[in-house]
């Protein structure tokens, strides 16, 4: 049992309040996922010539400056690093593939948890309220945000096993449910060149999406294909550079509710998380249909 929540702002005047609006939504899902929590927030887009990386290390005192200086020397590029908790946001004009390769060769202890132009991913073990505070998200500004509270069922309680999982540039996925064919699919995807850091079934779903997108599918097509290729019960919430997308499996036994006002669109495992938003009492509220892709902001 896990909790997933998402908030997309239609009213740009609310951007400065995104973190404050989202915090009670995430915390409300604590009883569904007290083991760990994570968020993907979309903010501060880089130049087109730059890439923003979300990096993580188990040591909160890790020296990120050596990553900064090492990349600049090795790749002859410009870098800027910002430490947030045991994570780091790295912005660089180096090629993404070159950065990932260099990190694997010289600093395998560092995990790349996301990349793109606007996405920033933060995740950690512990109660959602503590995780949110650790990464200073209370006053965060942005356009949209998705989050997850985890009660581990398929793998260990670790930071690496926490959601969201990156699925491509400015793309990430959170999941409520359980996939029964993730071990077989993981081996199939490994043969296609996909790499895995955990035994988490959600990481397999994220890798599946990445593979589909790399081989020509649109996000909507990838989500529709998942309905037949992935066995199990699931609700997926996928963050994109300009919005988010939602899909439930054909049986739709995992809870999900959506709501929309003139100011925002929200999704949550349970309505009580949405009820905390301003204007929720006047929102259009509905349960997403089985096997149907919903998207906002050009998300799919």
Enumerate the predicted regions with their spans.
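Conserved short alpha-helical segments that host acidic/polar catalytic motifs at enzyme active sites
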Residues: 1-300
């Amino acid at each position: 049992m896990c909790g997933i929540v998402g908030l997309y702002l239609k009213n740009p005047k609310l951007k400065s309040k995104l973190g404050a609006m989202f915090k009670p939504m995430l915390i409300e899902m604590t009883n569904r996922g007290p083991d760990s929590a994570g968020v993907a927030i979309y903010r501060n887009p880089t130049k087109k010539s730059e890439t923003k990386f979300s990096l993580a290390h188990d040591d909160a005192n890790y020296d990120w400056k050596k990553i900064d200086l090492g990349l600049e020397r090795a790749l002859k590029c410009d870098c800027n690093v910002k430490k947030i908790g045991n994570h780091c946001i790295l912005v660089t004009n180096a090629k993404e593939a070159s950065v990932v390769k260099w990190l694997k060769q010289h600093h395998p202890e560092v995990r790349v948890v996301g990349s793109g132009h606007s996405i920033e991913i933060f995740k950690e073990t512990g109660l959602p309220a503590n995780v949110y505070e650790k990464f200073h998200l209370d006053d965060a500004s942005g356009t949209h945000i998705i989050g997850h509270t985890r009660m581990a069922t398929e793998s260990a309680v670790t930071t690496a096993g926490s959601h969201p999982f990156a699925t491509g540039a400015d793309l990430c996925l959170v999941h409520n449910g359980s996939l029964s064919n993730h071990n077989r699919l993981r081996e199939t995807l490994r043969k296609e060149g996909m790499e895995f850091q955990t035994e988490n079934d959600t990481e397999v779903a994220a890798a599946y999406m990445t593979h589909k997108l790399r081989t020509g599918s649109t996000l909507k097509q990838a989500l529709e294909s998942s309905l037949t290729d992935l066995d199990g019960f699931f609700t997926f919430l996928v963050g994109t550079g300009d919005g988010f997308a939602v899909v439930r499996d054909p049986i739709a036994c995992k809870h999900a509710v959506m709501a929309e006002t003139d100011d925002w669109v929200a999704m949550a495992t349970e309505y009580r998380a949405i009820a905390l938003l301003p204007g929720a009492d006047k929102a259009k509220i509905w349960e997403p249909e089985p096997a149907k892709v919903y998207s906002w902001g050009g998300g799919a």
